[in-house]
Curated annotation (Swiss-Prot):
InterPro entries: UPF0328. Belongs to the UPF0328 family. This is UPF0328 protein ECU08_2060. It comes from Encephalitozoon cuniculi (strain GB-M1) (Microsporidian parasite). It comes from the Eukaryota.
Length: 263
């Protein structure tokens, strides 16, 4: 092989990589739209209608799919961030870069642990609480983080423009209310419907009335909105981790084993 062919081969590989990455981004974006709009309403019906009460396998599968989606989505975000980020001499940049990748990895691991915990755990009385407080908010949040935010250090921030900013804040407000307000499960449909409708409006506007603006994501208020979204994502996955650890301990008595080892 001649030396002149090496750059061409490298360029071809890079183009193929970009093409594959774009292909997966389209697939995950389409899946994210479904998980953030239609699926929450379907989940609500499965968990509140009496006709589904005895269909335990359907309820289990319904719970597993969101965590499978979040596992794939956060692994893809990790991969994209890892490929787009570059080591620099700035120590703060490198700390932020590795911390962000660590958190994305943690979200994926928690999603996997949640899948395992849901499969082995048979205490069905916990399903509704786990569903309403963790799973429903996590789906639109994951979609929002993957579409409205830029995660590359040095460019971290909220990137939506125009009315999408207002829509995203409304979606986030619905999710916060859904998680923090203590109401009956039957009353959650209002929050779910509003969040799904807003996500759909956001999608349609982006498709048919897309803005050509390319704002700097590092503007202070954009960074603040990103921090708000990301902080709530962390909060949701802390809840998911606690639920998973509790379920695993119930089955394997992990804490008792740790105590016996330490004593």
């Amino acid at each position: 092989m001649s030396v002149t062919n090496i750059p061409q081969s490298h360029e071809t590989n890079e183009m193929q990589h970009i093409k594959n990455q774009s292909h997966w981004r389209v697939i995950l974006s389409s899946l994210g739209i479904f998980m953030a709009t239609v699926y929450p309403i379907f989940m609500y019906l499965v968990f509140t209608k009496d006709c589904f009460e005895e269909r335990h396998l359907l309820r289990l599968i319904t719970l597993l799919l969101p965590f499978l989606y979040s596992t794939i989505q956060y692994l893809f975000l990790l991969y994209t961030n890892w490929k787009n980020g570059h080591k620099q001499e700035d120590i703060l940049y490198n700390i932020l870069y590795y911390l962000l990748n660590l958190l994305l990895t943690t979200f994926s691991i928690i999603s996997i642990l949640s899948i395992i915990a849901l499969i082995i755990n048979r205490r069905e009385n916990d399903d509704d609480l786990f569903f309403f407080s963790v799973i429903l908010p996590s789906m639109p949040l994951t979609y929002l983080l993957s579409t409205s935010c830029r995660l590359v250090p040095g460019q971290i921030g909220f990137i939506d423009t125009g009315i999408n900013i207002f829509i995203d804040i409304l979606i986030l407000s619905c999710l916060v209310s859904l998680t923090l307000i203590c109401i009956e499960p039957k009353d959650y449909l209002c929050f779910i419907a509003i969040s799904s409708a807003l996500t759909l409006v956001r999608l349609l506007k982006k498709k048919y009335l897309s803005s050509k603006q390319s704002p700097p994501p590092t503007a202070p208020w954009r960074v603040a909105i990103f921090v708000l979204i990301f902080s709530f994502v962390v909060f949701i996955y802390v809840l998911a981790a606690c639920g998973s650890i509790t379920a695993l301990d119930y089955h394997f008595h992990l804490f008792d084993k740790v105590k016996s080892i330490l004593s």
